[in-house]
Structures are given as C-alpha cells and as structure tokens.
Amino acid sequence: MGFINFIAELLKDPRTAIASWIAAGPLMAYGCVFLIIFIETGVVFFPFLPGDSLLFASGFFAHNGGFNIVALLAVAWSAAILGDQCNFMIGHFFGRKIIASGKVKAMTPERIKKSEDFLDKWGHLAIFLGRFFPFIRTFVPFIAGMGGMHWRNFVIFNVLGGITWSTVFTLLGYFFGGIPFVQEHFELLIIGIVAVSIIPTVVGLVKAKLGKKNV
C-alpha cells in the first residue's frame, strides 16, 4: 500500500509532493522521477501511472530551480529507455503466461487488440509513436516482445521515442514554468494532463462492461 499511497499523494497535491522530494535531497528527487517513469513504461501492471504529468511538473520545478534541467533530462531519458526495454523483455519471456493468467486487469482484450492493431499499422514506428499515447506506450513494448520483434529494431525506436517523449513533456513544463498563469494554476494543468490520460481508460472500461451486458 505504500507505493499506492505515494502515487495518490502525488496526484492529490503534485506541487507539495515534488517539493518534498526536492527538500529530501537530489537522490530522493531524481530517484522518484526515475522510479515512476521506469515503472510506468517498464512494468505492464502499472500503465496508469502519471508519466506525462510528472515530466511536465518536473520541468516546471526545473524552471524554478528545483531540478537541474540537464540532470533531469538525463534521468528521464534513462528511465524511459530502460523501462521500455524491460517491458519488451517481460513480453518476450513471459507475455503469453501473463495474459493467460488474467492478473493484469488493465490488459483487457480490447486494449490488447488496439495495441496489436497499432503495431500492425505502424510496424517498428509504433514503438516511437506509442510513447505519446497513455496505456498504449505500456502495452506496445510488451506485445512487441511477445510477438517476436527483433531486439535490435526495437532498441532503435525505443531510444528515439524515449528521448523525444520525455524531452517534449519536460521542456513544456520548463519553458511554460515562468508564465504567471501556469504558476497560478499549476494544479489544474496537472489535473488536465492526468484527465486526458485517464479518459481513454474510463471509456474503454465502460465499453467493456456494456459489451459484457449485451452478450
């Protein structure tokens, strides 16, 4: 429950949560950023973690001196790349067993199908593009590994996608962090980013439940 409470506090009051990490020292601050980004992208059981909003919020704090922007980007790149690589390997070695177990409730047949279709449509480029879609960015590496994509091809697009995604959201927070409106309405902006990430999930769950009722 400790980790769940940790995430709940981050979502409830991101400004206070991140400020407390920074106050605890660089190891805690950068470590928390790395941990959340790595787990969201690397562990298929946690696709709901707030990766986009955390990167934006961290960039905001970097603008105000809480993080060193170069160090923050390096941490974000490392977490995103290593996370996807871990997810790929989990899918490669344990993918079918995990799906068959039914223990990953977020991995509904609809989401698996959507991720597979995304891979079929875009091929290797799906690894890059999938970074910008919540849930898909967690499931695509897993399914790519399970489906036998060559490791070398995956690595290339993983690195490109990880660097691009983490840089875009971090720098958005960094460059917009000095705007008075952003400073005054920081929490609302974070809630908005989280909402955009969660809405597709809620819609998917509703559709799945309605589908079961109609069967």
For each of these PLM feature ranges, what is it?
Residues A23, G42-P47, I127, V155-L160:
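Short, amphipathic, aromatic/basic-enriched membrane-interface segments that mark the entry/exit
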Residues E40, T164, A195-I198, V202:
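Hydrophobic membrane-targeting signal helices
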Residues M1-L35, F60-F142, M146-N153, G178-I193, ...:
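Membrane-interfacial helix-loop-helix
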Residues A79, T164-W165:
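MFS transmembrane alpha-helix packing/gate-lining sites
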Residues F34-G51, G130, S197:
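Transmembrane alpha-helix interface/packing and boundary motifs in multi-pass membrane proteins
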Residues S166-G178:
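Transmembrane alpha-helical segments of integral membrane proteins
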Residues S53-F61:
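Hydrophobic alpha-helical segments within and immediately flanking transmembrane helices
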